[in-house]
């Protein structure tokens, strides 16, 4: 899996395609940590091309959502695919970590 980064000043967008399994969750975590260390104030995780996410992937999203929020910064999921949106809805996290709480929301 290749995560595509778009960086504009201190705003990062990470486009995550395919299935987010344990290995992909580790890769996502490394990319989020790199963004934080680089001074990102906003990190948007674009899941429009993601098909599925495991519990380790959800843990990464929640852990760094909380860390960023505590320091007055932002980490949000944007444009989740229907499958990802359904998983986040079932886990109760959709309204917490998804921008606008809906799939297909553009920044």
Predicted region positions:
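STAS-like cytosolic regulatory interaction modules
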Residues: 1-52, 63-107
């Amino acid at each position: 899996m290749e995560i595509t980064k778009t960086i504009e000043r201190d705003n990062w967008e990470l486009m995550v395609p395919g299935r987010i399994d344990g290995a992909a969750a580790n890769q996502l975590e490394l990319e989020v940590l790199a963004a934080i260390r680089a001074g990102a104030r906003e990190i948007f995780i674009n899941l429009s091309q993601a098909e599925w996410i495991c519990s380790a992937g959800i843990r990464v999203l929640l852990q760094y959502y909380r860390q960023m929020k505590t320091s007055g910064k932002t980490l949000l999921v944007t444009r989740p695919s229907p499958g990802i949106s359904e998983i986040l809805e079932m886990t109760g996290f959709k309204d917490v970590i998804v921008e606008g709480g809906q799939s297909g929301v553009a920044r």
